[in-house]
Amino acid sequence: MSGSKKKKITKADRLKQILEEEEKRQKEEEEARVKYEKEEMERLEIQRIENEKLQKLEAKDLERRNEELEELYLLEACFPEAEKLKRDNRFLSQWKHYIECDGSPDPSIAQEINTFITLWKEETNETLEEVIEKSKLVLNLIEKLKLILLETPPYDLQGKNIIQYQESILELQELLHLKFNRATEILLRQASTLADLDSGNMEKVIQDENVTLYIWANLKKNPRHRSIRFSETQTGFEIPRILATSDIALRLLHTHYDHVTPLSPVLTPSQEHISIVTDFVKEEVKSVQTAVSKDLQEENKQENESNSVHEEETKAEGQGDVEEQMCPVQEEPEATKYEMEMKLLSETVSAAQELLLENASEKPYFLEENEVDLCQFTTLGGVYHLDILELPPQCKPMKGWMIVEILKEGLQKYTYPPETTEDLEAENVFPPIEVTLEVHENVIFFENPMVARWDAEGKQWKTDGISNVSYKSEERLITFNLETFCPVTLIQDAHINMPYQSWELRPLDVNKVLLTITTVFTELQIQIKENLCMLASIKVNNKNHSSILEEKWMTPVSFIIALKKAGLNIFPTGHSHLYVVINYKHPSVEVKAYRQMALLSSAFAFCWSKWNTACESKKTVFQVREHLLKEEPIRNPNWTLLMFSGDRAQSLKINESSDAFSEALKEETEFHSTLYHMVKDFASQEAMRAVRRSNCQFVDSVCHMLLSTRLLSYS
């Protein structure tokens, strides 16, 4: 055999190799174990140091908690002060109305409003122009009553007053519509004298800031005259042959307000809320009585000592000394009484604010088929009252007089289609009527509007009986077929701008801020100063959009109503969470956050954070930075990320660009019980002075707008 032979490994060599590998493995395992234990010890040591540090910070926070809360309580005295000012203003406006004696009633006084209604009912033969002029006062009275119900805190509204105001509103609404019907009848009696020379029919259009009235009287009954267009408008009808040959009149009364939809229920506190406030009142009264009693006893003791030492002088001084000694006794109870009033008012305001954020557990009522859910949708642009009327007997000239037959039953509606018909093809004989309406110019629709009709029997808006709806957004025209004439309205999803994409609150001037809210369709900029709000600008689909609301200062409640009427609803209700995916935050946490953000808003800017959705419902996360008025706008400002639970505020280690959420405390920062003391750690003295000098009405208005928009839950 040739060539080298491969060396054969012996059993001893194999055993030696196995032992070496085992020793190496054990050595590596030991090194890994030692390394792991070392790292674990280091980690535990770091964790221990961190825990000790956190415990010290928590202990420090707990130690100064009472002091911080007391300071916050003093700052939050602006809320009861603002409420007291609002109460005083309500009384003052009533007094001013009383001394002006302008002839208009005070709608809050039942006797005055009832007298006004009775006297107006007695007025007859009013023309449409006269009714429209009178309607301005009536609408003003209705708005005043609605504002009383919305602006008065729930705890100040008695049940009987709510019923009284709502009944007055309904009676005024019904009477106003009745007056329009009577005035329409008077006009239609003269239709033959007002006939158009070309068509031979009567046509009249009356436009006003609150109503637009279109009336067409079919005098010629020409079967070929089936297309009706009112002059200088695109509003009109396509009527079937049977109507074109009938003694009828068509009326379109477009009220720019909605007096058809049932009144919204007034927000009232639950029994639980009432008991909380009642218990607080009892405790405060008891403590005040104890304090007053103690003060009086101390005063009497001092008085007795003074009398025993200076008995002779007292006798000589007589009554003068008695008056001097009584002064401090009278002053103390007055001061204590005021203090009790403000404490009670503070508790009432807090409870009312939490009531604003309560979420309903379910929808308020069961929906029928085709019924419009008024919790989900809202009517916009007013109501179009569509009526087919029987043409009343016409005026006839006779020997220099105008003779007219007046029907006892008044203005009668023409039934179309007839309630009973033997024709099997009734749809062909009585086809739907095509209606073309002009959409109110001051209303914004972000999607094509839906059309709803009023079901008088069921007292609800319904979507059946309407077909072939088409909308021309550029021309603001909507056309549809209607089976029978009745009031119709345009509806839009009330939550189309919810949830919000982002928001920012920043100072503009002394006691003036700008609130910017960005949604899928629009960006709204709202200015707030003192007790007023204003729409500063609006963008729709990233383009500037003009609105009649711009540059108009209004009280917060009036401003919210105006925005809703314009289709700019950014104000959730207690049922909104049933229709919108929200980032739920506990009401008590939200209220505390909004109150303290409002307190700081004169010197600090706040904005949304994407991490607010990552934390639990009892914690909120947002960004904050100092913003003094003299500063130039910063392109990329440095924001501090804060987490607030209502009881504790802390600065977070992460920022908006971090990969994951963490509640880790930012280095070299501490825990605090309030946002005020949290920002105080990094704020300038000038900023804190600006906060302390804030106007109470301004702070209250900012807080009201934050509570109404619910930025932390709906963004």
From Swiss-Prot:
Protein name: Dynein axonemal intermediate chain 7
GO CC annotations on file: axonemal dynein complex; axoneme; cilium
Compartment(s) of residence: Cell projection, Cilium; Cytoplasm
Bias type Basic and acidic residues, positions: 295-318
Domain of life per record: Eukaryota
UniProt-listed PANTHER family: DYNEIN AXONEMAL INTERMEDIATE CHAIN 7, LUNG ADENOMA SUSCEPTIBILITY 1-RELATED
Main location: other
Disordered, as annotated region: 291-322
Protein family according to the UniProt entry: Belongs to the DNAI7 family.
A single GO molecular function term of this UniProt record: beta-tubulin binding
Protein encoded by which gene: DNAI7
